[in-house]
């Protein structure tokens, strides 16, 4: 029961994590005109200041999480990002919004590597797909709740007050993390065997990570698939601008509608992705990424076609639902896979490295590149620049499909090979 209580609390923190992270995108139809931002500036704000600090700090935080008291580390991270979320509400322009995003990135970089390490020490391996899927239910629900806040409170409270409010909520939740105790780490049964913070142990963890990535094609292809999938996720930060400017919706109304879709479709995807990927791995000779291969292959046509249809079309709404469902399905299978392909002592580090590649490469290309692309298309007098940009980046993300296939195909062979490499 304690493991499930921990899982619920960490999922709640992850939900807040993505509410705060997504606020700029959810309030894009409020913030962009208020601050007079270009598409490139908006795309930059949603990624570069946050992602660079989030990704690089996350790698160090992953190493740190393998060595120190994890609930205390989580508490520090949540408090840090919440303070700067509140300060974002006072932004007067591009620079004053970019600066707090850097510190939000540092704070949020702590949560997932540390949480996944805690969960791996709390649940057996065969339930990690479920545990990771449940934890990552915070992603689509957080994105959806962020949109609901914009839709229901944006006009009445204003976007600035919403940032202040969420910062205060985060402070309370962050301090609550101190009520939890750290859990014994697997394969470390005594105080002497518990990892400690030192230069030598840090170097050894990094060497072990490099050795695992070099030895496992399944691990490499899982990481690569995630990067290409995150390119279209980065571009989707322009979704609300697309819906209002090129599909004619009212900004508050469409934020409410898509917010509810995100909550329920994403939550369903998390549960389905976690449970079915666990079943797939247990009952076939393939790894969890093969489940994502079939999911991506089957949903691809609608994922592109719905961009071109009228908003009163049934296909249009099915496309939005599938997008959030697929987002929900992604996290449980992939994060379980990357953790299971490395030694127990570097689980938090590999999660942090995976997050670094997803965000620093995938999201940055999708969001900032998407903004530059949309600005160029507007200057070239394209009739629907957001539509064309989103389609282009959706096509690029197709490369993730063969990567999922190869990762799923190689998973069980690589698991055996890595066991021999690390003598486990």
Where are these regions (language model features)?
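Multi-pass alpha-helical transporter architecture, strongest
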Residues: 176-181, 300-308, 391-424
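Extracellular/periplasmic helix-loop-helix junction of adjacent transmembrane segments
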Residues: 27-56
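Juxtamembrane intracellular "pre-TM" segments in multi-pass secondary transporters
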Residues: 184-222, 246, 424
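Conserved MFS/SLC helix-loop-helix module at the cytosolic interface between two early adjacent transmembrane helices
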Residues: 56-92
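Extracytoplasmic gate region of multi-pass secondary transporters
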Residues: 24-25, 216-271, 327-331, 335, ...
């Amino acid at each position: 029961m304690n493991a499930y209580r921990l899982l619920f609390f960490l999922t709640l923190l992850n939900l807040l994590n993505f509410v705060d992270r997504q606020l700029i995108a959810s309030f894009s139809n409020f913030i962009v005109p208020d601050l007079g931002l270009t598409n490139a500036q908006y795309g930059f704000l949603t990624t570069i200041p946050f992602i660079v600090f989030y990704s690089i700090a996350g790698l160090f935080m992953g190493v740190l999480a393998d060595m120190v008291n994890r609930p205390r580390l989580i508490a520090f991270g949540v408090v840090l990002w919440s303070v700067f979320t509140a300060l974002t509400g006072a932004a007067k322009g591009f620079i004053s919004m970019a600066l707090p995003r850097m510190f939000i990135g540092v704070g949020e970089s702590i949560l997932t590597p540390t949480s996944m390490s805690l969960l791996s020490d709390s649940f057996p391996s065969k339930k990690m797909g479920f545990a990771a899927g449940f934890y990552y239910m915070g992603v689509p629900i957080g994105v959806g709740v962020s949109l609901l806040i914009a839709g229901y409170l944006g006009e009445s409270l204003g976007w600035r007050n919403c940032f202040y409010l969420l910062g205060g909520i985060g402070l309370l939740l962050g301090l609550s993390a101190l009520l939890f105790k750290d859990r014994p780490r697997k394969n470390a049964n005594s105080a002497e065997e518990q990892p400690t913070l030192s230069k030598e142990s840090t170097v050894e963890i990094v060497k072990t990570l490099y050795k695992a990535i070099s030895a496992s094609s399944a691990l490499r292809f899982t990481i690569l698939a995630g990067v290409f999938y995150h390119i279209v996720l980065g571009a989707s930060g322009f979704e609300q601008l697309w819906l209002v400017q090129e599909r004619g919706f009212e900004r508050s109304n469409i934020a409410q509608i898509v917010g509810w879709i995100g909550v329920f479709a994403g939550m369903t995807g998390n549960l389905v992705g976690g449970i079915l990927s666990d079943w797939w791995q247990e009952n076939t000779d393939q790894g969890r990424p093969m489940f994502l291969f079939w999911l991506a292959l089957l949903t691809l046509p609608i994922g592109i076609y719905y961009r071109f249809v009228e908003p009163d079309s049934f296909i249009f709404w099915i496309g939005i639902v599938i997008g959030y469902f697929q987002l929900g399905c992604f996290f449980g299978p992939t994060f379980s896979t990357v953790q299971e392909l490395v030694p127990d002592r570097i689980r938090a580090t590999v999660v942090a490295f995976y997050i670094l590649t997803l965000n620093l490469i995938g999201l940055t290309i999708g969001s900032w590149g998407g903004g530059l692309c949309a600005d160029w298309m507007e200057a070239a007098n394209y009739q629907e620049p957001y539509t064309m940009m989103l389609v282009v980046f959706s096509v690029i993300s197709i490369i993730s499909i063969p990567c999922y296939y190869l990762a799923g195909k190689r998973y069980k062979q690589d698991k055996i090979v890595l066991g021999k490499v690390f003598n486990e």
